[in-house]
Amino acid sequence: MSVVRWPRVLTPSLLSQILKKQKNPVTALKLFEEAKERFPSYGHNGSVYATMIDILGKSNRVLEMKYVIERMKEDSCECKDSVFASVIRTFSRAGRLEDAISLFKSLHEFNCVNWSLSFDTLLQEMVKESELEAACHIFRKYCYGWEVNSRITALNLLMKVLCQVNRSDLASQVFQEMNYQGCYPDRDSYRILMKGFCLEGKLEEATHLLYSMFWRISQKGSGEDIVVYRILLDALCDAGEVDDAIEILGKILRKGLKAPKRCYHHIEAGHWESSSEGIERVKRLLTETLIRGAIPCLDSYSAMATDLFEEGKLVEGEEVLLAMRSKGFEPTPFIYGAKVKALCRAGKLKEAVSVINKEMMQGHCLPTVGVYNVLIKGLCDDGKSMEAVGYLKKMSKQVSCVANEETYQTLVDGLCRDGQFLEASQVMEEMLIKSHFPGVETYHMMIKGLCDMDRRYEAVMWLEEMVSQDMVPESSVWKALAESVCFCAIDVVEILEHLISSKR
């Protein structure tokens, strides 16, 4: 029987709204099927299929998702490339990379004219699973097709993989061949190859690469360029070639940044300490000089700050924030997120909390769900999941900041790891109400934890919820429940009645 009040006239947008409101993905699929029976003149479009596929993918219901994808192919409705990219990620996450490859190879059977995002996503997932040879085969076979209208992301990925296995020589060949592929190296291309050269100690090649930037892509004072320049300068300093680094800095300031002379920092060649502390000091001075030489703009400061924070260079990153504020720019949520992440990695949780509670408020910048998620993960990883729950409550009171699946999943996993199963149960209940679906492992962890706490009725309720979603509990879950029954006078018949009624 239907669980919704159907409208007199059904449209795809109305059905999408109905499906999104369903707590159970199985129920959503039944309504999806029922729609055509109730409304003979109605037809699903690409948007409805995308909604249904997204719901099934997020709940890891791979078989049902494959069924809906097959239906979408039969209906021949227009499909977005982003839908297939999402499905490819879902297949990979479920350990079914072969299904992802098979789907991509069959895209010509769907009404989809652009495969660029799916192509890039598949290659990324194959590289992640160390399927390098197969990824190269896919690249060679499909990179020239008209469906893939941009190859720069795939080529950058190929260069990155080659550099990771210390084959910057091959990555350099890919870089040089880009023009023949109908694309042009971007800053990411230069950054990847520069890092590859420097990691292998090929500083001469890295220097020539930097010079080529001056006339190929560099813009006056661009902070995005500084990210690449700094890789070489740091590598030269680490190799003890500080004098060369200072000389190249001068060329960067004159040709790359075209900075005024007042921005030149007084670092004289030969006047530096050869100790590790001395070299680190020179590196900091070089970075400060680059920051001063950049043309003040939000994009430049953002690129420099996030790059430094990603490398864990908190002091230098903070100097960028001070510089941008002095020029009248305020850090964005993206920059704050990078700073919070760096602080959490460094174990400085108090400072990370202060960024959200104090620094962002003073800068009149409201935290986004992304910033909150970074802090919540940092707190949970440090065993402070109960403190992290407070930020879920804080998000609910903030306008236009809605907790997403990552928020809930991180909190539930963190609370369970800390043995806070009752609190985890409450968060997971809210998670389901918001139509975010935990995975099988989360249910297993929750049920076994509640049994260990002698909270059998709550455990049974989650088992009932699990079974209602057609999930099959593993043997250890049944064992935990059986042991709980044996040690306490709980009615076994009552448990069975719960499970039987949930399947009706």
Curated annotation (Swiss-Prot):
Cell membrane listed as a keyword: no
InterPro entries tied to this protein: Pentatricopeptide_rpt, TPR-like_helical_dom_sf
Key words, A-Z: Repeat
Domain of life: Eukaryota
Cystine residue pairs: none
Each PPR repeat, start to end: 45-79, 80-114, 115-145, 151-185, 186-216, 225-259, 260-296, 297-331, 332-367, 368-398, 404-438, 439-473
Record has Repeat as a keyword: yes
Homology family: Belongs to the PPR family. P subfamily.
Protein name according to UniProt: Pentatricopeptide repeat-containing protein At1g05600
Organism (species): Arabidopsis thaliana
